[in-house]
């Protein structure tokens, strides 16, 4: 409603109260998204795609079929249907709660508070960066409406640029269309320093639980102005 009412989409300024939307929708995309591939595979064969080649093969077949249906709809309706690897942070929790109320708690499927986003390997599954990217990279070509694969680093890469570059190259070699690298960022609530803080804040020298003189805090605040 916002996009149409604000005339963001081409030809939306010509719409009247009883107008059909085809003339406007044809300029945009109609994305069919999905979450929970990992849980789907657990329900079907007892393993997700990070655990076995058999599950990976089935997962690829499922997502490939979804993409093919989107392509069929494009030709049938002459509209831009696309397949979306959905990052549904809110929906993943809502859907699993609904399914649990209907089907009960199923191990590996509805026993957590969320479904895994899109085709991601579950975050609770211990694996290597290389394996995770190799598994997820197979799905990027099918999800033409958007996709993302990311890894979580447990340390600071500022002093280890080679490791950071290696991760990027692994993503490239795994056909990752859109990759992200998350790393920890701390914030000192007293002096406001943002970065990786180990035992001592590199700006004010404060340790966890210690205070700092107000004059120093004011000095830090002024330096950020």
Where are the regions that the model predicts?
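Long, C-terminal-biased catalytic regions of enzyme "large/alpha" subunits
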Residues: 1-225
